[in-house]
Amino acid sequence: MAESVAARVASLRRFLGSPSGGACVLLLASLAGFVLANSPWAAGYTALTTTPLTLSVLGKRGPDTIDAWVSDGFMTLFFLVVILEIKTEIVTGHLSSPRRVALPLIGALGGMIVPALTYLLVTCGHPEATRGWAIPVATDAAFTLPIILALGRHVSAGARAWLMALAIFDDVLGIVVIAVFYGNALYWPALAAAVVVTAALIGANRIGIRTVWGYATGCILLWIALLGSGLHPTLAGVITGLCLPATALGRNVGQATPLDRAASALTPVVTWVILPLFGFMNVGVSLRGIHPDMMVDAVPLGIMSGLLIGKPVGVFSATLLSTRLRIATLPAETSMGKVFGLSLLCGIGFTISLFIANLSFPDSGLVIPAKMGIFAGSVLSALAGWLWLRFSPEQ
């Protein structure tokens, strides 16, 4: 009996420490937000997410509610972890050579351009709707990884690594889009301060400073400066991640690097706290007044088309072209048929897509239809990808 209990506890710990465990918590938190928003306690849920909590920097209004703090503040750590993941892969992982980097990067570029064009094609003639062109460009690794792990032998280890690298590149490209296209009017003194802090972080790396707390302080100062500058403050996580040293020096060689220590400390926080909070705050869409025919309106139809059609077409065609031109090679035990199935899974756009939807339609009635399009497109993409990879004949 004791051995049985111990085995179950060990199994639970393994699950909680796995990507699938994190995805389950994110899904449960998101469902909780959705259920509360459509329950008799909807008013309490709305009051919680919109609780005033205002910050102003240099005359620029910052996050003013709890859900805004989650999106503009806590999500900075999510973007930081994304950058740390890709740096780790480049230094020691599956992206440690240019040819290994090329395939997922080219696929991610195709998976960004074609969905955006698909969305713009569907929403042409609706000027306000076109602001959401970037919503279908990102892939959510938190949900794609558990699906391909559940497929087991149907997806090779090399194919899994390729999809995860592509999803990370997708997130990075999404961050670039946010920084470039979704900022406010620039305030140059604050932008100059952000440049100074960035230069200090780069200098700290160059002169061999390996104290993580120094970079954490720099990240906070950079976040404040970016908030005042008009650029999106979550860019602070990206810049700090790029500046964190990936190597140890001197007597510390062989020990954990600052990058490793930061990733070890932040990944559980992001997985178990920040992403579930984000899902809980952003998926609480009330269905009151929403009719099925609203799903064919420009915004949700454009998002669904971008995720379900644009994503797989963009990723697959870019990957096929890069292999035909011998720019990159497919992973071992991976056919173009498998690539197509994995390309379908790339249409699972959740975290970044919701994030961009909030930025695209602030204080607009279009944000709820946008979220409905994200949910529908992501679910259909997950189902289509799973069915293809599970039941299609080997190519």
UniProtKB/Swiss-Prot annotation:
It holds the Pfam family Na_H_antiport_1. Keywords: Antiport, Cell inner membrane, Cell membrane, Ion transport, Membrane, Sodium, Sodium transport, Transmembrane, Transmembrane helix, Transport. GO terms for molecular function: sodium:proton antiporter activity. The chain crosses the membrane at residues 15-35, 66-86, 101-121, 132-152, 161-181, 184-204, 219-239, 265-285, 301-321, 339-359, 366-386. It catalyses: Na(+)(in) + 2 H(+)(out) = Na(+)(out) + 2 H(+)(in). The keyword Transport applies. It is found in: Cell inner membrane. The keyword Membrane applies. One of its GO terms (biological process) is regulation of pH. GO terms for cellular component: plasma membrane. It is a multi-pass membrane protein. Na(+)/H(+) antiporter that extrudes sodium in exchange for external protons. Belongs to the NhaA Na(+)/H(+) (TC 2.A.33) antiporter family. This is Na(+)/H(+) antiporter NhaA.
